[in-house]
């Protein structure tokens, strides 16, 4: 509820939005706030209240997909479900990693909260085609229903190989279908599905 007073424009995003939508059982100790405003510091701690805010400065073209919600009588801006998922594949370091991004994708699609065409539209607007690589690989791994969008994603891959998990070491096999370095094992990525 403090975020609107700290920076404008703003939106609760990444791990905080994943938690709000119930796409992760993890409870982030930091509130992640997306903004286009340059700040002197990316982290703000309010010690008296025990709060930590992490500001993620985005290019204006990446600041979209927002909605308003009400929490305890306060209007809050938050990324919508599709933008939350896409943001997490763009910057996994702000959502707890690629496994948390995969959980978000799985929940959003299986619960019908996002449509595959909306994901395609948002990734295209973001301008980071590595998102298609990461999402495509995980959609196939988790056998998620995205229909013909999967083929659209494959047609729009960026050149070269990207890392599946930018937070993990740069090793592991190469996947030529999705042009990814698989630096996380399928078992690691799906372990949460069996618990």
Residue positions per predicted region:
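Hydrophobic alpha-helical interaction segments
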Residues: 66-195
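Short gly/ser-rich loop at a beta-strand->alpha-helix junction or flexible surface loop bordering the NTP-binding
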Residues: 1-60, 180
């Amino acid at each position: 509820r403090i975020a609107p007073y700290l920076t404008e424009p703003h939106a609760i995003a990444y791990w905080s939005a994943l938690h709000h939508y119930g796409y992760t059982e993890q409870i982030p100790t930091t509130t992640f706030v997306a903004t286009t405003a340059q700040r002197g510091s990316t982290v703000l701690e309010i010690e008296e209240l025990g709060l930590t805010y992490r500001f993620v400065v985005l290019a204006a073209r990446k600041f979209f997909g927002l909605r308003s919600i009400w929490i305890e009588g306060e209007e809050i801006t938050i990324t919508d479900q599709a933008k939350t998922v896409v943001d997490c594949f763009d910057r996994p370091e702000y959502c707890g990693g690629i496994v948390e991004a995969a959980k978000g994708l799985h929940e959003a699609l299986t619960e019908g909260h996002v449509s595959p065409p909306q994901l395609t539209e948002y990734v295209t607007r973001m301008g980071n085609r590595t998102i298609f690589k990461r999402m495509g690989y995980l959609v196939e791994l988790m056998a998620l229903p995205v229909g013909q969008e999967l083929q659209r994603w494959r047609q729009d891959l960026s050149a070269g190989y990207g890392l599946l998990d930018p937070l993990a070491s740069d090793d592991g096999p190469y996947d030529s279908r999705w042009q990814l370095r698989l630096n996380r094992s399928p078992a690691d990525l799906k372990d949460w599905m069996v618990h």
